[in-house]
């Protein structure tokens, strides 16, 4: 919708607070533009709703439930992520 003219295919976008509000809107827009969204949220139910909406726009999402204020949790969960092209630190 918002980023239709931007091609983000083969790019990975990490979005914190992706389950609600601005983070959610950014996640959907990035997915529409072709990015694979690495969505971080504290609640799995919010991530599941986001995943449904991203699939509606034919996007890809990697869901990660974690609290970014907990450094150990964040480090452990993101250790498997090899590349981040875009960061939305919400």
Where do the protein language model's features map onto the residues?
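Aromatic pocket-lining residues of Rossmann-like dinucleotide-binding sites
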Residues: 30
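The beta1-alpha1 cofactor-binding region of Rossmann-like NAD(H)/NADP(H)-dependent oxidoreductases
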Residues: 45, 64-77
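Conserved glycine-rich cofactor-binding loop
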Residues: 12, 17-21
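Conserved glycine-rich Rossmann-like NAD(P)H-binding loop of the short-chain dehydrogenase/reductase
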Residues: 35-49
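Flexible N-terminal pre-Rossmann segment of NAD(P)-dependent oxidoreductases
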Residues: 1-12
């Amino acid at each position: 919708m918002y980023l239709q003219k931007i091609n983000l295919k083969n790019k990975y976008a990490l979005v914190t607070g992706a389950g609600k509000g601005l983070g959610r809107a950014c996640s959907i827009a990035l997915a529409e533009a072709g990015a694979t969204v690495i969505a971080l949220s504290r609640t799995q139910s919010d991530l599941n709703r986001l995943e449904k909406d991203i699939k509606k726009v034919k996007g890809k999402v990697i869901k990660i439930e974690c609290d970014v204020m907990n450094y150990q949790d964040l480090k452990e969960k993101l250790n498997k992520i090899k590349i981040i092209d875009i960061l939305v630190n919400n």
